[in-house]
Design a protein with these regions (language model features):
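N-terminal Rossmann-like dinucleotide-binding module
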Residues: 2-63
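Hydrophobic residues in well-ordered beta-strands that form the structural core
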Residues: 85, 108, 133-135, 248, ...
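C-terminal helix-rich "cap/oligomerization" subdomain common to oxidoreductases
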Residues: 1-15, 74, 82-85, 131, ...
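Contiguous beta-strand/loop segments that form the cofactor/metal-binding neighborhood of enzyme cores
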Residues: 2-7, 198-280, 310-322
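Predominantly a Rossmann-like dinucleotide-binding segment in NAD(P)-dependent oxidoreductases
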Residues: 139-227, 347
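Beta-loop-alpha module in the N-terminal Rossmann-like domain of NAD(P)-dependent dehydrogenases
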Residues: 63-125
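Active-site loop of classical SDR/Rossmann-like NAD(P)-dependent oxidoreductases
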Residues: 51-54, 275, 299-311
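Rossmann-fold dehydrogenase core element
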Residues: 119-139, 158-165
Length: 347
């Protein structure tokens, strides 16, 4: 949740005991985050838990010294100092609450909950336990999006009154649970739109949201609240108390002529700024500032950002940080997600 500078050598020089971490769910994303943490030298990959023996074996290639366990109970009682959760979305809230009530800090994949109520329950558990909680809103930690945030925060754009954010994924998830509303909480809005909502509200300073209008589609057909299908295309307009309007569009499996389109544009009374991917890449981004017809580069080039959110959480864990009041922002994002689904269901 913010800028970060990781300096492993400085941390190691303090000769503090490295945190022992437990990893619940080590599929592709969980294993990637585990590998980043293992390579950082900032913590020990102590315990791994997954329902798939094959996936466990793949994870042991990354962390051969780790202990494997068969249940979450065993992981929580293994003498660890924090939990990394990367399981299907429906399990996030309950698993996070259990860890927090056990006195363990939590880093969880998004979404923290399928609804605002689930998300609020986790945040309140963290508050009551006074434990560190964060989720993997990874795009906040790209150098390009942070550059745009600095420009907006500086006031260089004047009053920002409009934002357009897009995330089109030409492929979509490969795991079947993403398409089960009960297990995922929703489709592309829950998977991709959460990043757009978080980025927009973060840039604008989390103003209160006054009104949300949305339309959802599945395979080109309008989707309403009576369907059990999840959306693969969504568009929404969010009006805020600051006067700014936010336009969001996201999709899975859409023909966009490239792997993906990821972009955020912000327009103010004195200029604009943008964050966008390069040549359809999921990983490479640039940031620019606009002055009339002039484009001014802010940042470009290689940026090893995947996993950076977890490292920021880990750095704060090593500093013995406790509950972060900014966790309330997670509830604000979840409330907008709820409003998008509610608006679409009333059409």
């Amino acid at each position: 949740m913010g800028n970060t500078s990781i300096a492993p050598e400085n941390v190691l020089n303090t000769k503090k005991k490295l945190p022992r971490l437990g990893f619940l769910g080590v599929g592709w994303i969980g294993r990637n985050r585990m590998e980043v943490i293992a390579k950082s030298g900032l913590a020990k990959v102590a315990v791994i838990c997954d329902t798939s023996p094959e996936i466990l074996q793949q994870a042991l290639v990354v962390a051969p010294q780790a202990k494997t366990v068969n249940s979450y109970d065993d992981l929580l009682s293994a003498g660890i100092d924090g939990v990394i959760i990367a399981t299907p979305s429906a399990q996030h809230a309950e698993q996070s609450v259990r860890a927090l009530k056990s006195g363990l800090p939590v880093f969880c994949q998004k979404p923290l909950g399928r609804t605002a109520n689930e998300t609020r329950r986790v945040v309140e558990a963290a508050r009551k336990a006074d434990q560190l909680l964060a989720i993997d809103l990874a795009y906040r930690f790209t150098a390009a999006l942070q550059a745009v945030h600095r420009v907006i925060s500086s006031g260089l754009l004047g009053d920002v009154y409009a934002a357009n954010l897009v995330f089109h994924n030409a492929y979509g998830p490969d795991k079947e649970w993403f398409y089960d509303r009960a297990r995922s909480g929703g489709g592309c809005v829950m998977d991709l739109g959460i990043h757009l909502i978080d980025a927009a509200l973060w840039m604008l300073g989390f103003p209160p949201v006054l009104k949300v209008n949305s339309k959802l589609y599945t395979q080109g057909r309008h989707l309403n609240g009576q369907s059990n299908s999840v959306e693969d295309y969504a568009t929404a307009q969010v009006e805020t108390a600051s006067g700014a309007v936010i336009n969001l569009t996201c999709s899975w499996r859409i023909s966009v002529g490239q792997d993906c389109i990821i972009s955020s544009e912000f327009f103010g009374t004195r200029g604009g700024a943008s964050f966008h991917n390069v040549n359809g890449s999921f990983y490479d981004f640039v940031a620019e500032r606009y002055e009339g017809t002039k484009r001014i580069p802010l940042i470009s080039g290689p940026d090893d950002w995947p996993g950076r959110a977890g490292l920021e959480w880990l750095e704060r864990l090593q500093m013995n940080e406790r509950f972060d009041v900014r966790n309330d922002e997670l509830v604000r994002v979840a409330e907008v997600l709820d409003a998008i689904y509610h608006s679409a269901s009333t059409l």
